[in-house]
Amino acid sequence: MAHVRHFRTLVSGFYFWEAALLLSLVATKETNSARSRSAPMSPSDFLDKLMGRTSGYDARIRPNFKGPPVNVTCNIFINSFGSIAETTMDYRVNIFLRQKWNDPRLAYSEYPDDSLDLDPSMLDSIWKPDLFFANEKGANFHEVTTDNKLLRIFKNGNVLYSIRLTLTLSCPMDLKNFPMDVQTCIMQLESFGYTMNDLIFEWQDEAPVQVAEGLTLPQFLLKEEKDLRYCTKHYNTGKFTCIEVRFHLERQMGYYLIQMYIPSLLIVILSWVSFWINMDAAPARVALGITTVLTMTTQSSGSRASLPKVSYVKAIDIWMAVCLLFVFSALLEYAAVNFVSRQHKELLRFRRKRKNKTEAFALEKFYRFSDTDDEVRESRFSFTAYGMGPCLQAKDGVVPKGPNHAVQVMPKSPDEMRKVFIDRAKKIDTISRACFPLAFLIFNIFYWVIYKILRHEDIHQQQD
């Protein structure tokens, strides 16, 4: 009986300790579970689980593989806009390029934060769109003081990728109205390898293109209206997504007025000063004319130095050509004045030579017929036509008068002839003083009105 009681005591003790051990294990498990709930997973462990080697994430495969295409929304923030070069027809811009897409493989719920800002080195661990700039001529990243890149992952799997770039983009320009032209420069964003079956670029709905506050250009006025378009590209390898933004640039005239138009205008006006200089001051007028022509030629060459060698005529070319024409015409005007003012000397020399020939001819005739006075009287020969005047008389010693025997008018004296031609030369100068400025004024009216209308039409076409 005592043995039975002792056995029951041992059995009850065993069950007691077994129950105590079980309760201890349960308590320990709950404690560990509570600790695990109160202490979240470390960021390193979380990232390893999300996109590490053990996560099964493959950056070589796009999201929704063999499914619908990935929609990537783009946004551009312009830090600086400038270095617009007409010779190379390109422009330089510094931007923040932001791309946003959804990758379901990166969605998470284990981590408490709504988003994670990751180091740029993690970019190699995830899939990224193969975006490139179709009209890019040169580009570079920024690495001071670190890589200027941003990677942010959201709970729902959205990915934000931002990068700072400096781009040199081509911008074909029509310079027919230069420097009163309006240009349109584009920026095209295109997928390099993924067709539209895999990837589609779209502009962000709100503020797709932003410009830094206070951004100004030295020679252009950047219009606030940004023209956003889709430019799908069709190649032999397929149809590729493409989006573009068009920047409308209106050239400012201030620089060209000061550097080109006003100096050339003053040179033309300076050439008119020769009209008020005495025609006898040949060195002064010739020196002034040649100087203005050479200066205008240099000015015209300088205006073309900063422009490409295009095959069409520009507005500045027309202006410079007309100014050069006016300056050269002023020099030719003095040549005409000088020629007219010296014509009396040539005329006197010609008359003297002609008179000598006429007198010699008359004397020859006279001696030929002087042997027979009767024949001379019967013929009633008159030497009036040969310049002899009343030296010889006809029959009865009377000079016949009639319609065929008009009395010769005595030529003017050399001084009178000189005065006539000098007055004519002075009249040319007087007419030039009025005609040259008037013609140049008419040209200016037509020039500025026509190109003002063309400029307005270009602006209107851009708005359409």
Swiss-Prot record:
Coiled coil: none annotated. GO terms for cellular component: dendrite; GABA-ergic synapse; glutamatergic synapse; glycine-gated chloride channel complex; glycinergic synapse; intracellular membrane-bounded organelle; perikaryon; plasma membrane. The modification Phosphoserine is found at S370, S379. Disulfide bonds join C171-C185, C231-C242. Zn(2+) binds at E225, D227, H248. Strychnine binds at Y235, N236, T237, G238, K239, F240. Inhibited by prostaglandin E2, probably via PKA-mediated phosphorylation at Ser-379. Residues 34-255, 304-314, 452-464 are extracellular. NCBIfam families: LIC. This is Glycine receptor subunit alpha-3. It comes from Mus musculus (Mouse). The lineage of its organism: Eukaryota, Metazoa, Chordata, Craniata, Vertebrata.
